[in-house]
Each structure stands twice: as C-alpha cells, then as structure tokens.
C-alpha cells in the first residue's frame, strides 16, 4: 500500500483488512489503489472477484456477472477510474477530494455528513455503483461523471443526492 503505483497501472484493487481506519457506516475505503475493509472475510471476498470492467469482456448471463461484480468493490473501482481522470495521480485525486469535502462541509447544518455525501466523487460513485456497465461509457476508462456534479452548486448537489442515498446503499 505504501508503494502505490499510478492509478492507470492498477488493474485490480487488492483488499486489505484495517478495521480501525473505517468509521461510521462506511463499508470500504480506497487508499492509494487498495480497498480497506472492516474484516478479513470482506477483504477475501473482494479479492476473489475477477477484475473485468468492460462489458464487452463480460458474459451475457447474469449468473456469470456475480463472479466479478459486487457493488462495494465497483464503487471503489469507480474511485480508481476517477483518480485516472485527475492527472492519473493519487495525490491530485486526494487533494481534489479534500477540497470538495471541505467546500461541502458548509452544508453540515442541514446535512450532518455533507462533506462526504455532497462530494462529487462520492456522488458519481454512489449514483452508479449498481450499474455494472457504467464504466463502459468512458472509452479511455477514466470516469469523469464527477465533473458534472462539481459544476453544480451545493444546493443543486443537495437536491441531486436524493436520487440515491449512500446510507441505504451501503
């Protein structure tokens, strides 16, 4: 984990169990190309999933879809593709993530976890984590849907977030 490669060099995000890193209701966290989980059992389950992220490589049967798809791992994979779209750098991705988080904290009086729930990166990931073909929309594999959310005002993001609910989806 401490010798992270560029996001474009990461084909499959390995999962590790570091339970004290995750607070609250978070199921997992992306950390420089790895997925941090609550338990070793979750980490092993995510590590057993086959890394196939292009629908052209996927079998048509839904039973085969279960061999590689899990919403939480896909959510974290969307973060990997977002990092590729931010100068292909984990540091740039986390810097932008922090800036969006800090900006959204102004809405904490209305929404207790606003820094997280109104973050454009999280909004894109939550809105699309149940669509296993979402990343196919981007020919170069870089998820850029977060840019649409970033152009919105905080009020627009607040109302747009009602289309999904991170607490219900996690």
Question: In which residue ranges do the predicted regions lie?
Answer:
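Metalloprotease/metallohydrolase-associated module, dominated by Zn2+-dependent proteases
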Residues: 16-26, 30-32, 37-39, 91-170
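Short pre-active-site segment immediately N-terminal to the catalytic Zn-binding motif
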Residues: 23, 27-28, 36-74, 116-117
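Activation segment
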Residues: 39, 46, 81-82, 129
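Catalytic Zn2+-binding segment of zinc metalloproteases
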Residues: 76-95
């Amino acid at each position: 984990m401490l010798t992270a490669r560029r996001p474009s060099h990461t084909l499959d995000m390995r999962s590790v169990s570091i339970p004290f890193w995750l607070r609250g209701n978070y199921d997992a966290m992306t950390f420089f190309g790895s997925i941090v989980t609550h338990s070793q059992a979750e980490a092993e389950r995510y590590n057993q999933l086959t890394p196939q992220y292009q629908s052209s490589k996927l079998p048509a049967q839904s039973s085969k879809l279960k061999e590689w798809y899990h919403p939480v791992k896909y959510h974290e994979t969307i973060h990997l593709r977002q990092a590729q779209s931010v100068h292909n750098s984990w540091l740039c991705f986390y810097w932008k993530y922090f800036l969006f988080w800090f900006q959204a904290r102004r809405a904490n009086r209305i929404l207790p976890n606003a820094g997280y729930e109104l973050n454009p990166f999280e909004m894109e990931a939550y809105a699309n984590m149940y669509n296993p073909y979402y990343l196919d929309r981007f020919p170069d594999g870089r998820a850029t849907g977060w840019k649409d959310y970033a152009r919105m005002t905080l009020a627009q993001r607040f109302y747009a977030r009602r289309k999904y609910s991170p607490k219900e989806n996690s």
